[in-house]
């Protein structure tokens, strides 16, 4: 709730056990799809091997941590009031890559279309049968940079590699400025 302003968008995969993604308002269908794809990737749908899921979004003003009178909300739950907008049949794909900022190696996770702007090298992943630790070791062995623990933390669940890519990332300072402007 601390990051969710009234006019921001609140994205949630339409499946129990999904993470919330908060983003500034946008009418751009491609941006909405990418945000929905990120929300879908970190949902339970990935962990159980589903390859598409619906994702809804609402304005921050429609979200409350308080239930209606006489009802109870479990810890971590929220109420959504009013009309939900849906992005249907979102493909579960996530790019996991790295970028070097000086001597520091950062692991980044992003929708596949955003990865070239954020990572030097990345893999587009889909739900699969390689456990997180095994997939992370395979990725780190190919990159020969960054740590296994950092890659494990970025993976949403059991995965397999769909494709490999290379990017030309913006400087970290530029990325930080974009997020500060939100």
Question: Which role does the model predict for each range below?
Answer:
Residues 1-182:
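Extended, highly charged segments
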């Amino acid at each position: 709730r601390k990051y969710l302003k009234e006019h921001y968008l609140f994205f949630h995969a339409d499946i129990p056990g999904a993470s919330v993604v908060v983003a500034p308002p946008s009418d751009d269908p491609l941006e909405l799809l990418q945000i929905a794809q990120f929300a879908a990737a970190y949902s339970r749908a990935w962990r159980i091997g589903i390859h598409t899921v619906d994702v809804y979004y609402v304005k921050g003003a429609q979200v409350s941590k308080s239930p209606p009178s006489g009802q109870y909300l479990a810890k971590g739950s929220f109420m959504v009031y009013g009309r939900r907008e849906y992005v249907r049949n979102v493909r579960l794909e996530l790019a996991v890559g790295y970028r070097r900022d000086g001597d520091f190696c950062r692991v980044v996770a992003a929708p596949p279309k955003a990865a070239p702007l954020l990572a030097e090298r990345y893999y587009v992943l889909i739900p699969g049968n390689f456990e997180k630790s095994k997939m992370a070791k395979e990725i780190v062995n190919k990159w020969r940079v960054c740590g296994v623990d950092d890659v494990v933390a970025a993976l949403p669940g059991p995965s397999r590699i769909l494709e490999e890519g290379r990017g030309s990332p913006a400087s970290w300072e530029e990325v930080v400025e974009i997020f500060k402007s939100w």
